Amino acid sequence: MSPDFRPLIYSLSWDGSRDGPSAPESRPEIPEDVKKAVRALLRFGGYKPSGRGRPASESLAKAGEEGRFPTIPPVVDYFKIVSLESGFPISEFRLGAPGEAYVFNPSGQELKVEGLPVLCDRHGPAGSPVKDAQRTKVDDSTCRFFVVVWGTSELSERLDTVAARVDAWTSEC
């Protein structure tokens, strides 16, 4: 792992009783310094973030610009908005091995994860700062989940703001 990698990690329980956030009125733009720092974090292991392989926070911002900000389970919506406003990719670690990949959407598309920091379970890689595996995504039946904010020490103040916001919200769960 990069010495600059500074994750926020939460293990949470969700009973579905709390409302999720509203989509932001205006679509926040991710500042260039944030994009640069997050992409540098991904490049550490040799991954090349671009196109479909860009950080999840950038994909989310683009979806928002295009009016494609779907409403999904409130807990996922909450972290999508935190990602959108902070610019940090957020997933629910090791570097991906050569040839390792996982399906990230219902149509079966794969993300090659060689060189990326990945979350794994007994079945293999399950998430990364680019996309999460389809088989491990949170849905309406999810009660317990794991969240990672893929932060970097270069943006410590911004990460502290995210931590305070998430701590405040999760203290009510």
Identify the meaning behind each predicted range.
Residues 1-173:
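Charge-biased, low-complexity intrinsically disordered regions
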